[in-house]
């Protein structure tokens, strides 16, 4: 039976989830989702993290009780299935209740002021409002919402039996009738106004609700009679809609926009403003002092900002990929930094502190593969426009570009041991060798045998041989002196990844047939075939520098650590909520890094498998 792989730290933030960033009242912790995992992070130290794991799919919403004792989280699931709501005890970090009523998705959650009730809102396929008893985890009562879609739910701050919901052209104030065990709605009177509401905040005295709309205005609703009172900002609407709202202790309203703008409103005129990268999806008030207040802002670009004081001067606290990560790479014999690539960005990270060291932006293009030159002088990358771009690892400035390196996208790249040549693989099936001079990049050879995209290229330490893995069901070993095929490996699969054993006598491949196959590197015969996954394809492989352990990851979202010689899975890491696209073992054998389609970077403690010598 495989043991769990210990998750050391995570780089990532589910920025697209509305109100997904929460500041805990203890003054030390911020809470946010990443895929199916909930991260509890120390504000000052990004490496000080704890994880709540219990969801089977992506977390869709979070809510924290007023005292900070309880955390509720909802998830999204497959069509036709019920989505779980989990209540966590944050003191013990334990799961208290798991509740399921809503179909497909839990849209929003909120605790009552006395922490007795939890309100949950179903997604588009469910659209029901349910009231839960926090102590027992049982549903108390429920009601279908408006015929149109409802986006958000918020309890009053002083009345535990009153709450407000708002959505597409609808707004209701609900009162819980305990005697009859019913939720009774009151429609808001908005006159001729028609709005799609994205966020709701109730003021401290329960007098007014402030509702952000896709039109870009904020409506002030008098809650006693549920009547439209005022609108703002006074000097024009927020571009791309109001996506997040929050009341600060002074009674002013913080408004975040889809264009990344942040404004502080007092009686609807704007007092101050700033702009951040990405649509603002959550605003979390942290603390208040004599000079002003502190809060955190989460954006759809997966950035977390901390604008300090009432003048809104922002500081970037944390950043992450906002889309799938296609590849990752370590420099040769150096474990402190690693690079990742995805749509529009290459990022360089510091492993120990989990901080971004460098961000290279190439807008509107996707980077499919990344590698360091062996001497560490350049970051090599292959792009969707068929170009190979090399960047300086410290400056981020472009060193050279090979235009039209491939007819289609560049899907695989590698550097020889002397850094004098680059090998690249293309979506059209070509493997090309490039001579890199001081001022020139010359095509040495173009090897055409593959009929499908080249997904991975590895070069032998001596530099006289390489192997390319392709979606056409073949891996080809090439002689880099004659540029001819030495031998081929065939299987009924799309090969996704290939690695050499450190002694280079064997190759290991993985692909869509869910098998991990060992091959003799000289004659191309299969030596051993093991089941890499029970459910889905295996996308990524890595071997440690001594050849003791093999690490795999794929569509089953599991990181598996195998004993290389025995072919036995000793450790399994569970944290990803999307397919794993790349894995790597640090050269010092202390950590394993995995990246996936959810945009998260997961750092695991390396565990040495039991070898034949230990038995």
Curated annotation (Swiss-Prot):
Disulphide connectivity of cysteines: none
Keywords of this entry: Cell projection, Cilium, Cytoplasm, Flagellum, Repeat, WD repeat
Keyword Repeat included in the entry's annotation: yes
This protein's GO CC annotations: axoneme; ciliary basal body; motile cilium
Annotated InterPro entries: WD40/YVTN_repeat-like_dom_sf, WD40_repeat_CS, WD40_repeat_dom_sf, WD40_rpt, WD_repeat_EMAP, WDR90_beta-prop_4th
Segments annotated as WD repeats: 54-98, 101-142, 145-184, 232-275, 320-359, 362-401, 405-444, 449-488, 490-529, 533-572, 575-614
Location within or outside the cell: Cytoplasm; Cell projection, Cilium, Flagellum
Primary localization: cytoplasm
PANTHER family per UniProt: CILIA- AND FLAGELLA-ASSOCIATED PROTEIN 52, WD-40 REPEAT PROTEIN
Main function: May play a role in cell growth and/or survival.
Recorded family membership: Belongs to the CFAP52 family.
Name used for this protein in its record: Cilia- and flagella-associated protein 52
Source species: Chlamydomonas reinhardtii (Chlamydomonas smithii)
Gene encoding the protein: CFAP52
